A protein has these predicted regions:
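Short, well-structured N-terminal submotif of metal-dependent ribonuclease cores
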Residues: 1-37, 51-65, 107, 116, ...
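Generic structural signal for small/hydrophobic residues in well-ordered secondary structure
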Residues: 7-8, 45, 85, 104
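Alpha-helix capping/helix-boundary segments
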Residues: 9, 41-42, 81, 100, ...
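Active-site neighborhoods of divalent-metal-dependent phosphate/nucleic-acid chemistry enzymes
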Residues: 57-61, 69-114
Length: 127
């Protein structure tokens, strides 16, 4: 099964945070599951670093290390994802999350997230 990690899940995994659910940990530790991080999450992290809403000592390179060190695969932004965005219900206003949702729908992935707005869409999600 293919999983798409929301940005906070990448950060919590790297920190070994107690906020990470047991289900999420189980999937993340499962060597047979395909775990992806979208370039969208790196973009979101870069913006939050710039506005100081996110603190990473090593800046954006540290975020990329988190992705690499945990064996997550990187997913680019494809045109198909962008084509879907205008057709999504307007439950979620965050453009990063809307692109993650479009990615998950197009690629038939399960999103790992705590975001209840994401969970309102007719997609597979796990927490």
């Amino acid at each position: 099964m293919k999983y798409l990690l929301d940005t906070h899940v990448v950060l919590w995994t790297a920190e070994n945070s107690p906020l990470l659910s047991e289900k999420a940990k189980s999937v993340i530790l499962d060597e047979n599951s395909e775990k992806y991080v979208s370039v969208v999450s790196a973009w979101e992290a870069a913006i939050k670093l710039g506005t100081r809403k996110l603190q990473l000592e090593g800046g954006l390179p540290e975020f990329f290390r988190m992705v690499d060190d945990n064996g997550f695969l990187t997913l680019p932004i494809e045109r198909e994802y962008l084509r879907l965005i205008p057709h999504l219900p307007d439950y979620h206003k965050d453009p990063f999350d809307r692109l993650l949702i479009a990615t998950a729908v197009t690629e038939n992935m399960t999103i790992i997230t705590t975001d209840q707005n994401v969970q309102r869409y007719k997609i597979l999600w796990l927490w």
